[in-house]
């Protein structure tokens, strides 16, 4: 196993794709810093900490693509046969790949965080107010994000090892994008409220402190959004589907990444699972993906 | 050269990637037509317009998807020359590297033109047969179609350059990254160009929106329990406002690079100082530069 890892690392530093992936992570981090700087310029509440845990989202695309390009070289150049011929077991090869891809994921995360925190704190800042994430939120979220990164690494190795065709990087890219869009779409569905207010017109009311707030008028009576009579929302999804979608959002690494990064900007996510639960799902996914990958890889005809 | 083109085209018709990208283009065209129908219904019922020019604003809308299609097709189609080793066969039978490069460029150019033809044919026929309210402006439509040609030349040249010089099977990923960069950069640059010279400081004021009797929304400001107007707010120079030298650079890049041209051709952004003839000239220039550089580099490349 040590020889396999040593061979991987020797190839890693010389691989252009590794540096391209790191640049992509740095680019995404810079977008977050620039966006924060822009919002602060206009006096809007913003913080670079909004984007700190966001790193898992570009990682969920960059890491599978990198793994696909890097590990596919074993099939393309036939080096996998050399590894097996020298007595390495398929399990050892697969696990060495998983360790490598997870470590690459950590390096990519560090690249992202160095721009986000290193450059971001000096160029933009991290104001601490009620609606912005605190350092405590970030410290709690970081271990969870590492578990999610492990899940992403497991998915990447599963795809890269089971698909031998040279177009696997494209498959990895499309799968990453598809699952990320699916996570956004599921979140939108889960956000549909179960009840809707019944009213004749929306009005502007003045509350006790003299501030204008949104209200509803029905049959001549003014209500606040909380007091207004409500009816069931016909667009809301029924129970078996709702539970299924919630499970899918929690089990998929892209769904976990979405919840993690959305959690850091407040309760925008429909179903933010508590950090411990999210981490457990991430580790569960890792176990299932790795177990499946090992089972199939051991029986696979490697020609 | 004729043999090379004939071999390339016979491979193109049998290539699944060519048909898949074509299917994507068709799907986008049909979506565009459905959006047109929705817009037409809205214009006729809500705005009570009797006739309007629906065709001219939509003729250039294929530019964005063409950029994406070329970014996907070029590497998937051309890279197999390296992967299957057919490039060696072409050189062994006496073809020059320049001929191989140009044949590949012309094949990708033909694919791009076919995709554009598909889009324009479906769009214009749909309007012609199913939108009797359309006011045809043949001159404007022709000018837009002619303006698309240098753009197509430059996009095909740029992606052929990339794919011919990168032998690795991961060139598809690089190509898609380039396409994402070409599409992301113009929006960033345009947003910066739109930044005002001065910005308003709220100074503790809150912003609210009210709707008057005619249904028009109006913004008003509230500070210390009092309603104030926009003139009462302080203005300071905007640090994100671009100074003239940088403005000129950003405007140049928006007009020169295919990404910015794609957005302008599809009327998504309106760049000050951008015009059809200028973009056409830049498109021709970029295609010549990319092809020239590609030919030079390809001749020196170690093909192993």
Tell what function each PLM region has.
Chain B
Residues 273-282:
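Juxtamembrane/start-of-transmembrane alpha-helix segments at the extracytoplasmic/lumenal side
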Residues 1-13, 265-266:
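A short amphipathic helical element positioned immediately N-terminal to and/or at the very start
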Residues 282-304:
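Junction motif at the cytosolic side of a transmembrane helix
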Residues 11-15, 61, 84, 168, ...:
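Membrane-interface junctions
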Residues 81, 94, 165-166, 300:
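Helix-loop interface residues and adjacent transmembrane-helix termini in multi-pass membrane transporters
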Residues 16-77, 102-176, 182-184, 188-199, ...:
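Secretory targeting signals
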Residues 76-110:
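Helix-loop-helix units of permease transmembrane domains in multi-pass membrane transporters
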Residues 5-6, 83-85, 157-159, 276-277:
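Short hydrophobic "helix-edge" motifs at membrane interfaces and signal-peptide entry regions
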């Amino acid at each position: 196993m040590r020889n396999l890892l040593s061979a991987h690392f020797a190839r890693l530093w010389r691989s252009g794709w590794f540096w391209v992936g790191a640049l992509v992570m740095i680019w995404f981090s810079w977008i977050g810093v620039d966006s924060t700087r822009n919002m602060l310029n206009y006096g809007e509440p913003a913080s670079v900490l909004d984007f700190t845990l966001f790193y898992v989202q570009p990682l969920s695309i960059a890491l599978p693509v990198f793994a696909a390009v890097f590990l596919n070289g074993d099939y393309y150049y036939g080096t996998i046969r050399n590894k097996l011929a020298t007595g390495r077991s398929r399990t050892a090869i697969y696990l060495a790949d998983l360790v490598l891809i997870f470590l690459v994921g950590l390096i990519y995360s560090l690249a992202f965080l160095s721009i986000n925190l290193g450059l971001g704190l000096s160029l933009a800042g991290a104001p601490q107010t009620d609606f912005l994430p605190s350092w405590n939120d970030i410290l709690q979220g970081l271990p969870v994000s590492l578990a999610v990164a492990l899940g992403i690494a497991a998915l990447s190795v599963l795809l890269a090892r089971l698909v031998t065709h040279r177009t696997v990087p494209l498959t990895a890219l499309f799968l990453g994008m598809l699952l990320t869009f699916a996570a956004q779409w599921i979140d939108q569905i889960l956000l549909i409220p179960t009840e809707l207010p019944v009213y004749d017109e929306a009005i502007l009311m003045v509350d006790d402190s003299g501030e204008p707030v949104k209200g509803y008028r029905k049959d001549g009576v003014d209500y606040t959004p909380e007091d207004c009579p409500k009816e069931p929302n016909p667009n809301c999804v029924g129970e078996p589907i709702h539970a299924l979608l919630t499970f899918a959002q929690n089990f998929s690494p892209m769904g976990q990444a979405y919840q993690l990064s959305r959690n850091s900007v407040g309760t925008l996510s429909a179903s933010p699972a508590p950090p411990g639960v999210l981490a457990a799902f991430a580790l569960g996914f890792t176990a299932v993906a790795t177990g499946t990958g090992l089972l199939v890889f051991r029986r696979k005809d490697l020609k | 050269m004729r043999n090379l083109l004939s071999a390339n085209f016979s491979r193109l018709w049998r290539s699944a990637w060519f048909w898949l990208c074509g299917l994507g283009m068709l799907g986008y065209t049909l979506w565009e037509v459905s959006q047109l129908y929705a817009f037409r219904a809205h214009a006729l019922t809500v705005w009570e317009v009797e006739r309007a020019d629906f065709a001219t604003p939509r003729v250039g809308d294929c530019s964005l998807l063409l950029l994406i299609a070329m970014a996907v097709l070029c590497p998937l189609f051309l890279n197999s020359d390296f992967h299957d080793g057919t490039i060696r066969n072409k050189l062994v039978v006496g073809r020059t590297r320049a001929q191989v490069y140009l044949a590949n460029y012309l094949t990708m150019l033909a694919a791009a033109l076919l995709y554009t033809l598909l889009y324009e044919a479906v769009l214009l026929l749909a309007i012609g047969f199913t939108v009797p309210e359309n006011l045809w402006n043949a001159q404007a439509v022709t000018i837009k179609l002619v303006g698309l040609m240098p753009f197509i030349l430059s996009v095909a040249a740029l992606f052929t350059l990339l794919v011919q010089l990168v032998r690795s099977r991961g060139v598809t990923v690089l190509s898609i990254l380039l396409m994402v960069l070409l599409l992301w950069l113009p929006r960033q640059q345009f947003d910066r160009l739109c930044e005002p010279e001065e910005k308003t400081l709220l100074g503790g004021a809150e912003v609210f929106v009210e709707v008057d009797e005619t249904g028009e929304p109006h913004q008003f400001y509230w500070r210390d329990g009092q309603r104030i107007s926009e003139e009462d707010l302080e203005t300071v120079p905007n640090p994100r406002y671009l100074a003239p030298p940088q403005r000129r650079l950003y405007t140049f890049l928006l007009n020169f690079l295919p990404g910015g041209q794609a957005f302008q051709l599809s009327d998504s952004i309106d760049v000050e100082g951008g015009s059809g003839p200028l973009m056409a000239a830049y498109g021709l220039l970029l295609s010549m530069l990319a092809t020239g550089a590609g030919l030079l580099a390809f001749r020196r490349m170690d093909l192993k």
